Amino acid sequence: MNTFVNFNANPKNKLGCDCVVRAISTAMREDWITVYRELCDLGAELYDMPFNKDVFGEYLKRKGWIWHPCKSENGKRPKVCNFDKANSAILRVANHLVYVSNHEYYDTWDCGIKSVYGYWTKLN
């Protein structure tokens, strides 16, 4: 079982609309503004918004992360609170990203009941 950790990587402690930057910067141990700027640059390169899944998916791929879709078992997908497929991962749930590491998920709100559509792990 994973435990919720109330954590906000946003340097101004703002809430909302930046889960992509928060999850990625926390997972990569990069500062929020660096990740935000790099996503914006890639968004401009791809002519798309930086928080679009195609943009952040490409960003993670270029940074050495691998996408793993979560297949439903018996019609159900794993929940954030019981995700156990990787020790450290960025999880994609409905309209949201969250970082999980060592049985803790880091976010500004408890998204533990959300179903996991897929996740990224760092290629070693």
Labelled PLM ranges:
Residues M1-D48, K53-G64:
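Active-site nucleophile-adjacent alpha helix/oxyanion-hole segment immediately C-terminal to the catalytic cysteine
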Residues L42-N95, S101-D110, S115-Y117, T121-L123:
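Conserved active-site-adjacent core of cysteine acyl-enzyme catalytic domains
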Residues M1, L123-N124:
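Short intrinsically disordered terminal tails
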